[in-house]
Amino acid sequence: MVDCPDSVLVIAWGNPLREDDAVAWHVLEGLRSLKPRPGLPALHLRHAHQLTPEMAECLSRAAGVVFVDARRDGTPGEVRCEDVAPGAGSNPLAHSLSPQALLLYAEQLYGRAPKAVVLSIAGERFGMGEALSPVVRRAIPTAMRVVLRQAKAWVGTPAGTTTTRPA
């Protein structure tokens, strides 16, 4: 749970057994490996196979949220960062949600939806397997820099990384 309003929640989701669909998990592990230092914003890191309604409370407490995911369109390895706002986009009875729907849940259930972006990396291969394609693997440092730049824009630079894992 994110208890600090001056921290940024990073949620990486995807299937770690579907090649490039796992790129978000690798971005999260790269962020987790960073040693605390001056200028590093406070991050709460979380990975999941899908976005679920139970995440709404945690989102409502963060200064901002970066959703990290793979995507099928675009040039493989291309990193895209787009603002996202609360809104429809998922079946309310579905087991997984879009970032927009999850933000809407946070707003409606807990009175607050944080600023949020979706950082996506275009994949090349989505078959069965655990290895990333080389072009997607090379995009990980760029994606990490985008996450850190966005977090600094939202909260400044309090040092530290806190990790949380799905229950």
Residue ranges of predicted features:
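Short "lid" loop at the C-terminus of a central beta-strand within the Rossmann-like core
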Residues: 124
